Curated annotation (Swiss-Prot):
Keywords: Cell inner membrane, Cell membrane, Membrane, Sugar transport, Symport, Transmembrane, Transmembrane helix, Transport. Belongs to the L-rhamnose transporter (TC 2.A.7.6) family. The gene is rhaT. It is found in: Cell inner membrane. Uptake of L-rhamnose across the cytoplasmic membrane with the concomitant transport of protons into the cell (symport system). GO terms for molecular function: rhamnose transmembrane transporter activity; symporter activity. The keyword Disulfide bond does not apply. The chain crosses the membrane at residues 4-24, 38-58, 68-88, 101-121, 137-157, 175-195, 207-227, 259-279, 290-310, 321-341. It catalyses: L-rhamnopyranose(in) + H(+)(in) = L-rhamnopyranose(out) + H(+)(out). One of its GO terms (cellular component) is plasma membrane. It is a multi-pass membrane protein. It comes from Yersinia pestis. Pfam families: RhaT (PF06379). This is L-rhamnose-proton symporter.
Length: 344
């Protein structure tokens, strides 16, 4: 395994760690509705940071985006909106299935679809099956899926041991939402593939290869922002128990800390895809679809580790933690298998 691939895997791990931790600042927000908190974090992560970073990177911000046709930008935007729908469904999936089952099904589906659909649609899947490296990377995807399933099972054991249940358990509704979440969340992977002309144009402007994907986030995350923010704003405007005015009428010190913690969560969310771009740049082009598999499997891995560090796994038996550790080791094994396959 060469140094570039190792670096790519490491950067994907860093991005996934940021994703696994981003909700922690939100837990410090007090006396605000979820919709207000999510909107403030979203404004930072989906609009302010992508636009600011791109403005600093590009020699001529408006000329860069103006150089692309609608036919190029629209799929990127729509796949971003597709991801936004998946993002909303994610929360509803947890509501009806609980964390462990919801994460296991939703992440498992988005890992498979986001990773394999691109080479299938591009007619590259037969080539992958016909090469040793391709077969090894596909084996890595399968092993990662097993790891996700094991970690999810550990979560189920933990929930049972601690007496935790889904907010409104509904298997039929939850499964439908989990499948929808898994499919739509893969939109981010499809958007990155559709944005390749934007990456190439950024590279032609002399932008470092680590940063060429970042300008495309203005369009990708713009699509996701419209879906997420519209959902929040509609709820804030129509539900009687929600009020932006009430949220912003809290004591000034609390208002400032709420804004800062929400903004920090937004920054951490953005950093997952900042480092995703770095990792993506180091992955061999013929295996670029593997970036999504690495990100999603590392997200589950880091989520488990963060849970251990925050002592969320303190329950009456040791079995859940033991199963969690096995699942994490399987995901690490999967990343190594994929890395060796890409280097073959």
């Amino acid at each position: 395994m060469n140094n570039a691939i190792i670096l790519g895997i490491i950067w994907h791990l860093v991005g996934a760690a940021s994703a696994a931790c981003f909700y922690a600042p939100f837990k410090q927000v007090k006396k605000w509705s979820w919709e207000t908190m999510w909107s403030i974090g979203g404004l930072v992560s989906w609009l302010i940071l992508p636009w600011t970073v791109s403005y600093l990177l590009l020699p001529d911000f408006w000329q860069y985006y103006g150089s692309f046709s609608i036919a190029t930008l629209l799929p990127v935007f729509l796949f971003g909106a597709m991801w936004g729908i998946g993002n909303i469904n994610y929360g509803l999936t947890m509501r009806y299935l609980g964390m462990s089952m919801g994460i296991g099904i939703a992440i498992g589906i988005t890992l498979i679809i986001g990773t394999l659909m691109t080479p299938i649609l591009q007619g590259r899947f037969d080539v992958l099956l016909g090469t040793p490296g391709g077969r090894m990377t596909l084996l890595g995807v399968f092993v990662a899926l097993i790891g996700v399933a094991i970690v999810s099972y550990a979560g189920l054991l933990k929930e049972r041991a601690m007496g935790i249940q889904a907010e409104e358990f509904n298997l039929k509704k939850g499964l439908i939402l989990a499948v929808m979440c898994g499919i739509f969340s893969a939109g981010m992977s499809f958007a990155m593939d559709a944005a390749k002309p934007m990456h190439e144009a950024a590279s032609a402007l002399g932008i470092n290869s680590l940063y060429v994907a970042l300008p495309s986030y203005v369009i990708i995350m713009g699509g996701g922002a419209i879906i997420n923010l519209s959902y929040c704003f509609i709820r804030l405007a129509t539900l009687k128990n929600l009020s932006v005015k009430a949220d912003f009428s809290v004591a000034k010190p609390l208002l400032i800390t709420n804004i800062l913690f929400s903004a920090l969560a937004g920054l951490m969310w953005y950093l997952q895809f900042f480092f995703y771009a770095w990792g993506h740049a180091k992955i061999p082009q013929q295996y670029d679809y593997m970036s999504w598999m690495l990100h999603m499997s590392f997200y589950v891995l880091c989520g488990g580790i963060v849970g251990l560090l925050l002592k969320e796994w303190k329950c009456s038996t040791k079995k859940p933690v033991a199963v969690l550790c096995i699942g994490c080791l399987v995901i690490i094994l999967a990343a190594n298998i994929v890395g060796l396959g890409m280097a073959a």
